[in-house]
Amino acid sequence: MAKLAFVKRVLESTIEAELKRRVEATGGICEKVRAIGRRGFFDRIIILPGPRIIFCEVKRPRGGRVSEHQSGYASHYEALGVPVAIVRNREDIDALLKS
């Protein structure tokens, strides 16, 4: 009988915790946003040395979809010249910290 391969599901909260840890390791701030009445607003506001401010949406690596509301916020903020990031994994965190 063949063995079944189980893939560990990575939760959004796991990615979010890693993002916070890595941002704070650079001396930055990674604030959780609770925007009451603002459906689809970003999960985190990141402030990095420089200063650089980035609005960030965190999604789980597999199956985490950006909603229409979230996409709308991202498009609007980017049109205003505000950096926006969608983070799904460690590679995305690396890219955010290097940009």
Predicted segment positions?
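Catalytic phosphate/metal-binding cores of nucleic-acid and nucleotide-processing enzymes, i.e., regions
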Residues: 1-99
